[in-house]
UniProtKB/Swiss-Prot annotation:
PROSITE patterns: RIBOSOMAL_L14. The keyword rRNA-binding applies. One of its GO terms (biological process) is translation. This is Large ribosomal subunit protein uL14. Binds to 23S rRNA. Forms part of two intersubunit bridges in the 70S ribosome. GO terms for cellular component: cytosolic large ribosomal subunit. HAMAP family: Ribosomal_uL14.
Length: 122
């Protein structure tokens, strides 16, 4: 469960290491974001020669949460931390690689590229 001011790790090779959620997209009163939701983030920590710089604002999709996601069969998929993948204005991933596992819930028309780049889909 991600809300404003939440810190997330970045699970791609854009050069960003840490981001902070500044807005949960999808309605004026929307408070929390889960796996597969799009949020606005500010880059808080970045590699020196990365594709993104500290302080820049991007869209991102949440790919892992410590809260987890409940499946239809009753199982719960949780992770050790929260992670996101940075997106451009067309909601396509900026990076060319994804690090760590992602969940099956991302298998929608919008994020198939992320699922295909991920090393493991849970």
């Amino acid at each position: 469960m991600i809300q404003m001011q939440s810190r997330l790790d970045v699970a791609d090779n854009t050069g960003a290491k840490s981001v902070m959620c500044i807005k949960v997209l999808g309605g004026s009163k929307r408070r929390y974001a889960g796996i597969g939701d799009v949020i606005k983030v500010s880059i808080k920590e970045a590699a020196p020669r990365g594709r993104v710089k500290k302080g820049e604002v991007y869209s991102a999709v949440v790919v892992r949460t410590a809260k987890g996601v409940r499946r239809q069969d009753g199982s719960l998929v949780k992770f050790d931390g929260n992670a996101a993948v940075l997106l451009n204005a067309k909601l396509e991933p900026i990076g060319t690689r994804i690090f760590g596992p992602v969940t099956r819930e991302l298998r929608t028309e919008r994020f198939m590229k992320i699922v295909s780049l991920a090393p493991e889909v849970l």
